[in-house]
Amino acid sequence: IVLMGSAIGTCEEVVDELLTRGEKVGVLKVRLYRPFSAKHLLAALPESARAVAVLDRTKEPGAQAEPLYLDVMTALAEAFNHGERETLPRVIGGRYGLSSKEFGPECVLAVFAELREAKPKPRFTVGIYDDVTNLSLPLPENTLPSNAKLEALFYGLGSDGSVSATKNNIKIIGNSTPWYAQGYFVYDSKKAGGLTVSHLRVSEHPIRSAYLISQADFVGCHQLQFIDKYQMAERLKPGGIFLINTPYSVDEVWARLPQEVQAVLNQKKARLFVINAAKIARECGLAARINTVMQMAFFHLTNILPGDSALMELQGAIAKSYSSKGQELVERNWQALALARESLFEVPLQPVNAASPNRPPVVSDAAPDFVKTVTAAMLAGLGDALPVSALPPDGTWPMGTTRWEKRNIAEAIPIWKEELCTQCNHCVAACPHSAIRAKVVSPEEMEAAPAS
């Protein structure tokens, strides 16, 4: 494979593993693209190479092919014509990573599988399911072992502190241990109030994995409402730890989980823990900021830092982060740390409870077909799995899809108080769901209006 940019680390990771299995594969890294050096390319590419895939992270509509592919192909063809190479390998070109599509180990395996074919596709895409042009390569299951010591996922709500907490975790692990730490953060344009997914890797070796975590040793659900909406337990490795922030007790929580989640936890033989982080945050005067509590729970359950060193490191990080806002806030966060360890409880796994609810549909049955197929998949966090045919060919989007996006994630219900309302109309203009609607009426019409 010939490529450049951030996908190199992923390719190297896969190639190193395949070489230990006796496979004859390699990756050639282009470090300087312009001016393109055909001489250095030919020196680096062994004569024994029989098939080459050139990957471009761009699309050139109207061109014969993508830029890097054309440069490599020209260099090889000219060398062959001039007698500088005795053989001309088969060269195919592919696209990857457009619009931030994932490029993981399974994509590299798919490219090598295509190169082994007797007649590989001369042009292909990888990391996308294209059922319109049929250029996409089928992705095999990633069977390569993970080099990470720990892989963790944190599902939070924008502004609850989950992203900041994970960034702090990376700093603590990187500064306080001999290990390497890496983080990726996925959140939508809503930011405050939207879903945030934090990906944390810890390894004894430098981390080359430039892709998101698909299967984790630890999954933290920082908002109980997410249990009904997102496939979190499904992303646990067998025997992994699943932590839920919930107001329910150890005896109550199992029956509250959807049957699908219960079945997955049993199948994976997971360890289930609960903590009432929202209650601790309220008691310590931290409002909705549960990040400190969930940080302590993560370190306590994973034992990444031994003994009380996690507590000491977190106290130091809190003092550094919040000292500018006053010692009182620092001490409130320290208090939350102490309460967090005492408030963690393990829930024994039980058979699937037939009386427990099933996962509700993401959108109402009354929704249009487009909302059921496309919007619903995106709301469930499965938008990347949508085929090309599911999306409008001209890129237009139907109007009014927000009305079906009822997330039901609030812990408290706001109540309009007539005596406090100044009728500024800001809430009417700002609310995307039109919970409160304004009407323009004449004084005469108001006289005939009902009382409410």
Regions found by a protein language model. Give the residues of each.
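Short beta->alpha junction loops
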Residues: 28-34, 93-97
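Redox- and metal-dependent alpha/beta enzyme cores, enriched for Fe-S-associated oxidoreductases
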Residues: 2-23, 36-41
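Phosphate/diphosphate-binding loops
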Residues: 54-135, 201-248, 256, 347-348, ...
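Active-site phosphate/pyrophosphate-binding segments
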Residues: 98-169, 174-179, 191-192
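Short helix-loop-beta junction
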Residues: 13-27, 78, 172-178
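Active-site cofactor/cluster-binding pocket
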Residues: 35-40, 48-51, 55-66, 148-158, ...
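Ferredoxin-type iron-sulfur electron-transfer modules and their immediate structural context
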Residues: 310-314, 323-452
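Long hydrophobic segments that form regular secondary structure
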Residues: 6-10, 145-147, 154-166, 408-409, ...
